[in-house]
Amino acid sequence: MPGVETIKSSWADEVELDYGGLPPTTETIENGHKYVTEYKYNKDDKKTKVVRTYKISKQVVPKTVAKRRTWTKFGDSKNDKPGPNSQTTMVSEEIIMQFLNSKEDEKANDPLLDPTKNIAKCRICNGEHWSVNCPYKGTAMDTNLMEKKAAAAASAAVDAPKSGKYVPPFLKDSQKGGMGMRGRDDTAAIRISNLSESMTEADLEELVKKIGPQSKMYLARDKNTGLCKGFAYVHFKQRKDAAAAIEILNGHGYDHLILSVEWSKPQNN
């Protein structure tokens, strides 16, 4: 009688005969690794066995994170083990957050600390530099400056009696001259105050030479140090130029200081 030939079956056939369906997922831990075995159907409707290997490592986390991992799961994940389930949970990309304190925010928003902001402003071209250093001096850009000078001279001649302010007698009638006892004409003289100690005669001439011709300039200096005492006198040849100088330079920023320009008061005889 011939012997019966035995045919070896595959593990998939054995699993199908034993369980008649998909076996449950199993997990085993050996030598610092976790092996997860699960069964599923592939595209051809055949049972497949998938084994995933995880390396176990210890990680120091904040207390709040460790406490959150001990929360009881609910819903469809009620019977899942601690940690994310690969079938229901997908880990997205890691986001790194950087926290700034309030002092750094205030420092970043401080406009005075902005290196791109310049405190200087030119009166000729509105650039970020002083008017004395303007590259457009003497060009067509000076047209606006000359118009201001003419308007200031006209307002000084017409509107001065209507302002209601005190006007010195030597300024009430420009046609009478204004010659003092010493023969000096002070009607076209102005006083410039709040000058820096580093001010020189060349700087003073550069400041007023575009306004009109001058007959004399005096920069007050300290006898001991030779530094500027903070004020100067400029005598223009025409009174309208002096009025224009007051209109243009009064309140003008120069060398980090705000200039104060007014009519020069005559000396007492």
Curated annotation (Swiss-Prot):
Which Pfam family is an annotated match for this chain, by its short name? Answer: eIF3g
Q: InterPro entries annotated for this entry?
A: eIF3_g, eIF3g_N, eIF3G_RRM, Nucleotide-bd_a/b_plait_sf, RBD_domain_sf, RRM_dom
Annotated keywords: Cytoplasm, Initiation factor, Protein biosynthesis, RNA-binding
Domain (RRM) spans 188-266
Q: Does the keyword Coiled coil apply?
A: no
Q: Name one GO cellular component term.
A: eukaryotic 48S preinitiation complex
Molecular function terms, GO-annotated: RNA binding; translation initiation factor activity
Which superkingdom, per the lineage? Eukaryota
Q: Which GO terms describe its biological process?
A: formation of cytoplasmic translation initiation complex
| Protein's cellular compartments | Cytoplasm
Q: Gene3D superfamilies from the xrefs?
A: 3.30.70.330
How is this protein organized at the quaternary level?
Component of the eukaryotic translation initiation factor 3 (eIF-3) complex. The eIF-3 complex interacts with pix.
Biological role stated in the UniProt entry: RNA-binding component of the eukaryotic translation initiation factor 3 (eIF-3) complex, which is involved in protein synthesis of a specialized repertoire of mRNAs and, together with other initiation factors, stimulates binding of mRNA and methionyl-tRNAi to the 40S ribosome. The eIF-3 complex specifically targets and initiates translation of a subset of mRNAs involved in cell proliferation. This subunit can bind 18S rRNA.
Family in the record: Belongs to the eIF-3 subunit G family.
This protein is called Eukaryotic translation initiation factor 3 subunit G-1
Species in which this protein is naturally found: Drosophila mojavensis (Fruit fly)
The gene it comes from is eIF3g1
